[in-house]
């Protein structure tokens, strides 16, 4: 069995790690970097760029360069978070037939799992290049506050990338694994993981206990916001620059897609610089132009100004921290260590706010960019059976239930329940002689079902006629270790049962996933196709060159009709060579070979006559063979009848 790799599929950056014995290793990608930008670009010629190469060309190709696709994964187009992103993103967010948020690129609609699969494929390739063997299994991380639809969509992305996803693990839990495994402190420790990434925020309270030499990681509670992260911080800077530039120059950059892409790069760079310096210059020459000529942008941004721009965003992370502490049933003073995860936690103001809330300095010995991937790799080793000293007890982040009479949400499994878990409850019919019941499954904390996220629905039919409240229908909720829900309903009277794995009432169907898996395989076969096309084109061009040359020298010996046929075949092949159709090129090449056969025969006869006249009959055979070959006609060598050797003519003349 090959290694199970750990992948942190991030909003902004992704990372892959493996275990080598008892040591973890983060693997550098083909560019030598330990993290890869989660950016995918779709080129005009069909090529797909991933990572740094996609990021570099974003300014010139903003509409077809997709970043932060994770913010759309498992989401409906109508959700307010998606609607907010539509105005901000340079690419087009479209509504899929099933109501999901998809992305439109070069006239094609793509599902977010399909886009994320490109990043996962690069992570897979990075690991394979390092290990020198195929990789088929992975543990992939998700924000702890991801709902069922988002987890399922992430798993689908793994499948599309050719990976068997052994486990979906929560990012803060993975970071805790990475932190806790190499710590020698004895006794139980409670840690808070504050994870502020590119697009999502999570906080988890985790207890690390030593149980008979085994480290037990138990998640006590989790909370967060799946639409708050570094991208939002960047947007605050972009909005500020646009406003300042409009004040100074009277030009609104918000409608200029190219300018926006340059602003995004500049904002991200400025944000990073201000983590270590007090001020930075944002300098973008030729940002736009009007009737008076080109306009240049030069704005000074101080750390204090940045902090005032994003203060409210940082403040938004504190409420989930408060809730997580309360749900865990502990007080802030019970926390032993605070771990910071995600690139945004490098910002001094974020660290200051975390210290203020938890009353202690956050740990600095955890790499915020790599800890999550490392934890995923550790979990991979546990799942493969190579590690026996770790037990991970995770929780479901949101309550799960069904809609009952009056539109009420009846909770079956409450939030922060340790998973895997199973729960059954008996319900009955609301009307007399009701032949079927519809089970609608929701996720969320609101008392009214419709205010929560509808995950899916199914029917249990064939209930025998009976009075209201008589039939006994047992509904069972079963959450697996990935946090993915399976629901079944059974009529206790008849034994009839129906069940579903919740795949969101939309999501990708099995057929769509299979199609995307095939598309992904086709992508890998693309290079092979391109090579075959080049070879066919070379062969065709050689045939055109050879026959045209022979025609100019020996064409006068042909009848007008024969000459016209060859010239028409040359024209047809030249037209085919301008296209991308390999089969058409090969077909027209073969047609030209057949059409030029008469020319070959004439040259063969000429060569024989010339040889006889010179009294060199013995050598006529080889000479004729060369002549026929040079015309592209039917050569006597059967295995060569489709190959045109354009060099042969030069030998004959020489």
From Swiss-Prot:
It comes from the Bacteria. Residues 638-654 have a biased composition (Basic and acidic residues). Transmembrane segments: none annotated. Keywords: ATP-binding, Chaperone, Nucleotide-binding, Phosphoprotein, Stress response. It holds the Pfam family HSP70. Residues 610-654 are annotated as: Disordered. PROSITE patterns: HSP70_1, HSP70_2, HSP70_3. Induction: By stress conditions e.g. heat shock. One of its GO terms (molecular function) is ATP-dependent protein folding chaperone. The modification Phosphothreonine is found at residue 200. Residues 610-637 have a biased composition (Low complexity). Belongs to the heat shock protein 70 family. Acts as a chaperone. HAMAP family: DnaK. This is Chaperone protein DnaK. It comes from Paracidovorax citrulli (strain AAC00-1). The gene is dnaK.
């Amino acid at each position: 069995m090959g290694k199970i790799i750990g992948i942190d599929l991030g909003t902004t950056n992704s990372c892959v790690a493996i275990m080598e014995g008892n040591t973890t290793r983060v693997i550098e990608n083909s560019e030598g970097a330990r993290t890869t930008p989660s950016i995918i670009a779709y080129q005009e010629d069909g090529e797909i760029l991933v990572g740094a190469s996609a990021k570099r060309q974003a300014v010139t190709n903003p509409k077809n360069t997709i970043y932060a696709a994770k913010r759309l994964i498992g989401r409906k187009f109508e959700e307010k978070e998606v609607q907010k992103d539509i105005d901000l993103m340079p690419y087009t967010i479209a509504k899929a037939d099933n109501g999901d948020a998809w992305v439109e690129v070069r006239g094609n609609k793509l599902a977010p799992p399909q886009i994320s699969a490109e990043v996962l494929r690069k992570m897979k390739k990075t690991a394979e290049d390092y290990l020198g063997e195929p990789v088929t299994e992975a543990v992939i991380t998700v924000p702890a506050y991801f709902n069922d639809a988002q987890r399922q969509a992430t798993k689908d992305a793994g499948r599309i990338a050719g990976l068997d996803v052994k486990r979906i693990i929560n990012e803060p839990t993975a970071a805790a694994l990475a932190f806790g495994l190499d710590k020698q402190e004895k006794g139980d420790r409670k840690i808070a993981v504050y994870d502020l990434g590119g697009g999502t925020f999570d906080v988890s309270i985790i207890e690390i206990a030593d149980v008979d030499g085994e480290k037990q990681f138990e998640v006590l509670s989790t909370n967060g916001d799946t639409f708050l992260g570094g991208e939002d911080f960047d947007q605050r800077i972009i909005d500020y620059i646009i406003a300042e530039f409009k004040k100074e120059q009277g030009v609104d950059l918000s409608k200029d897609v190219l300018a926006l892409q340059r602003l995004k790069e500049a904002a991200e760079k400025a944000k990073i610089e201000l983590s270590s310096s007090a001020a930075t210059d944002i300098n973008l020459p030729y940002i736009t132009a009007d009737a008076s000529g080109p306009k240049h942008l030069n704005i000074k941004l101080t750390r204090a100004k940045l902090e005032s721009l994003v203060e409210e965003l940082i403040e938004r992370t504190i409420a989930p921290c408060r809730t997580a502490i309360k749900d865990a049933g502990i007080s802030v003073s019970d926390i032993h260590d605070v771990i910071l995860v995600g690139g945004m936690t490098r910002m001094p103001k974020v660290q200051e706010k975390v210290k203020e809330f938890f009353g202690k300095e956050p740990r600095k010995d955890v790499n915020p960019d790599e800890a999550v991937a490392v934890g995923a790799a550790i979990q991979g080793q546990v799942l493969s059976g190579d590690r026996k000293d770790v037990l991970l007890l995770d929780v479901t982040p949101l309550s799960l239930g069904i809609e009952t009479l009056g539109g009420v949400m009846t909770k079956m499994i409450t939030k922060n329940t340790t998973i895997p878990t199973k729960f059954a409850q008996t319900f009955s019919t609301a009307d007399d002689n009701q032949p079927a019941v519809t089970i609608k499954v929701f996720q969320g904390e609101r008392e009214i079902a419709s205010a929560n996220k509808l995950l899916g629905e199914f029917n249990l039919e064939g209930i025998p006629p009976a009075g209201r409240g008589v039939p006994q229908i047992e509904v069972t909720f079963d959450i697996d270790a990935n946090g993915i829900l399976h629901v079944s309903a059974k009529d206790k009277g008849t034994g009839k049962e129906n069940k579903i794995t919740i795949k969101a009432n939309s999501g990708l169907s099995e057929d769509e996933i299979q199609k995307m898996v095939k598309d992904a395989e086709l992508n890998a076969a693309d290079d092979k196709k391109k090579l075959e096309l080049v070879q066919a084109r070379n062969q065709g061009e050689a045939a055109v060159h050879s026959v045209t040359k022979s025609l100019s020298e020996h064409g006068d010996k042909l009848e007008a009709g024969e000459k016209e046929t060859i010239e028409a075949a040359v024209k047809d092949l030249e037209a085919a060579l301008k296209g991308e159709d390999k089969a058409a090129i090969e077909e027209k090449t073969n047609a030209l070979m057949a059409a030029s056969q008469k020319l070959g025969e004439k040259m063969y006869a000429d060569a024989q006559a010339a040889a006889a006249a010179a009294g060199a009959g013995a050598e006529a055979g080889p000479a004729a063979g060369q002549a026929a070959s040079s015309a592209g006609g039917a050569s006597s060598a059967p295995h060569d009848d489709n190959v045109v050797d354009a060099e042969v003519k030069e030998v004959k003349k020489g």
